Amino acid sequence: MAVGKNKRLSKGKKGLKKRAQDPFSRKDEYLVKAPSTFATRDVGKTIVNRTVGLKNANDSLKGRIFEVSLADLQNDQAHSFRKIKLRVDEVQGKNCLTNFHGMDFTSDKLRSLVRKWQSLIEANVTVKTTDDYLVRLFAIAFTKRRSFQVKKTTYARSSQIRAIRKKMVEIIQREASTRTLTQLTKLVPEVIGREIEKATRGIYPLQNVHIRKVKLLKQPKFDIGALLALHGESSTDDKGQKVEREFKEQVLESV
């Protein structure tokens, strides 16, 4: 006799199904907070499994990386092609406190910059900020026609490209090595690109000069005090806003 399972005997009642449990019933929502250097602090919400036994929800949240458009963070659509990466470093209550983790361009913006009849110049610099963050900055630039030029093409010579790249490296090193990571994130969108464009005008005129990518290579030992200061926990909450205050001279009372 064959030994096996008798399918006829093991059948249960028809029509009964196992009750499906909602997976979101075991999860909690946390708010993602951007540093106070940005105009908009509330990035969005993230979900995580509730703390059960030795599995802590805070440990699951720490280290998460969120990609946000700079246009949403600064309320300015001119920065819509820049993507900012934010990393969760600390969880306080239902708030995830983040720090800058990198910057990148959208692929459609990069593709729109590359055109015919011009030279593409790229440079990358690894630099250490004053607060011991090791970052690598990638710069991109394109040649443009001179005001009196008749020729259609704007190809730069190899010697000119080398001279422009040298200037790009010098400016990026000077601007990045003398500032903190927070100050660097403010300079990256426009300031460094304009400085490069101005400095290389005598070699060959450039256009569309950008820091297209910022990569975080190494960070210092975690300091909760520095993170709280970055989020304005120990100071006023007007960081990230435009400074539009009038200067008023203090009048000292006579003693």
Swiss-Prot record:
Spell out the molecular function terms from Gene Ontology.
Answer: structural constituent of ribosome
User: What binding partners and quaternary form does the record give?
Assistant: Component of the small ribosomal subunit. Mature ribosomes consist of a small (40S) and a large (60S) subunit. The 40S subunit contains about 33 different proteins and 1 molecule of RNA (18S). The 60S subunit contains about 49 different proteins and 3 molecules of RNA (25S, 5.8S and 5S).
Specify the protein name: Small ribosomal subunit protein eS1
Gene Ontology biological process terms, A to Z = translation
Name the Pfam families for this protein.
Ribosomal_S3Ae (PF01015)
Q: Bias category Basic residues: which stretches?
A: 1-18
Keyword entries, A-Z: Acetylation, Cytoplasm, Ribonucleoprotein, Ribosomal protein
Q: What gene name is given for the protein in this entry?
A: RPS1
Tell me the residues on which N-acetylalanine occurs.
A2
What is the first-listed, main subcellular location in coarse terms?
cytoplasm
GO CC terms on record? cytosolic small ribosomal subunit
Region Disordered: which residues?
Answer: 1-22
Domain of life of the source: Eukaryota
Bilayer-crossing residues are none
What family classification does the UniProt entry report for this protein?
Belongs to the eukaryotic ribosomal protein eS1 family.
The record ties this protein, via PROSITE patterns, to: RIBOSOMAL_S3AE
List the InterPro entries: Ribosomal_eS1, Ribosomal_eS1_CS, Ribosomal_eS1_euk
Q: Where in the cell is it found?
A: Cytoplasm
